[in-house]
Amino acid sequence: MQPTDTMKRTMAEVVAQRRTEMSPGRIFAEACAAKGTDAVVEYDVTITDSLTSSRRKPRYPARNMIKVVDLSKDPRRYYWHESLPDPGAPQVHEADLRREAANRFHRSPVPELLPTTAWVQVPPDLWEDIETFESFINYRLIVRLSTAENDTIIRGAGGLLNMPQIARMTSRGSFSSTILAACNEVEQMGGTADGLIINPADYYAFMGEGRLMDDIERNGVFIVRTRLVEPGTALVGDFGHGALLFDAGRSVIRFAEPPPGTFAEPGGLALMAQIHERVVVNLPTNFFVVSL
């Protein structure tokens, strides 16, 4: 597993490369200048993975925690996963020491990818200023798409929090926090707890009370702060080896009619961005939803 400082250097290299490329917003803004509201741009990348942030304080999306499988470049039929042994299953040699030795192995088909969609209302004539329209697409439409993607990965119909095979942990045992207890439990299963998804309210409460968040991050745990985890809970797991994000490797931006209730005020031009993806867990025994 990469140390946090190595991961940050790698991200800096990615940022430097992306600054030399045309942004998704620029591509669409130029298409709109040429075709007006008939403009449709289909990208051969997932656009939530193609933007860089100018923020001095990063806030990472959930997709950055998980190995992404771009099915357009790396087609798959199946994925493997494990489960705990059935009650009464035969004893496995040294499973009391190496718990994972008793796990069962499975093969499942790659599930149907789910659409993730975001909408914005375009202020009148904004597209006439290409630079401003580019910024609006990049930092409103695609940022909203990133939020919708977090929902797909974390709490949507196929999201991590809705997977019944991921256990809940309410007791911290001999540790000072259930987060640390879960990290230990993952390692007792032969994995490494390399990721934490936590509500900002709890993240900053821990910051004010002590050094837990700093200690966890210095220990190499990648932290995602998001409203999509209920306050008082967090998700701890082996994201690097224990989960996959299947990705279509395709995106689209176009003008379209939004569903009712999308905006506070009806009317005006609506712009839609959409991607397709699905998260799966290979090692559900290496994830815990903890009560803080």
Question: Which residue ranges define each predicted feature?
Answer:
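A generic N-terminal leader/anchor concept
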Residues: M1-A31
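Assembly/oligomerization interface modules of large self-assembling protein complexes
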Residues: G25-T116
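Helix N-cap / beta->alpha transition motif
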Residues: E42-T48, P123, I198-D202, R225, ...
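Short loop/turn segments at secondary-structure transitions that flank enzyme active sites
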Residues: L84-P87, L126, T147, D151, ...
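Short conserved micro-motifs at the rims of enzyme active sites and ligand-binding pockets
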Residues: A89-Q91, T132, M207-G210, T233-V236, ...
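Alpha-helical scaffold segments that mediate packing/assembly in large oligomeric complexes
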Residues: E94-M189, F288-L292
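Extended oligomerization regions of viral-like shell subunits
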Residues: A157-E277
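Structural signal for terminal/edge beta-strands and the immediately following C-terminal loop/tail
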Residues: I275-L292
